[in-house]
């Protein structure tokens, strides 16, 4: 099992994982954490999108999570099913709002 991680700033869309040529990966989990502090008023909330992209990037055709609210200091976990990506496929994360997000992806080569 391997992991990759990165930081996605507010207003950015980042490729958090790109499958190399000749490889296939099974994504076992994706963790997205709001780097802001806990704030019951919602002042540290951010929103995020998660995409699995093949070929050209088309948001409406590749969206896994759509504009989800991620409160300050909270973590979203996607781990109920494996997501299989072939060579050149990508996982992208887009963040908007007050804070950046830390993203960790766990995967297996298959």
Please identify what each model-predicted range represents.
Residues 1-29, 34-35, 54, 87-88, ...:
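C-terminal interaction-tip segments
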Residues 34-41, 81-84:
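Short linear motifs in intrinsically disordered
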Residues 56-88:
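Intrinsically disordered, low-complexity Pro/Gly/Ser/Thr-rich segments with frequent PxxP/GP/PP motifs
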Residues 37-66:
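Short, surface-exposed beta-strand/strand-loop-strand elements in extracellular ectodomains
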Residues 49-52, 64-66, 79-81, 94-95, ...:
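Beta-strand-rich, repetitive solenoid scaffolds
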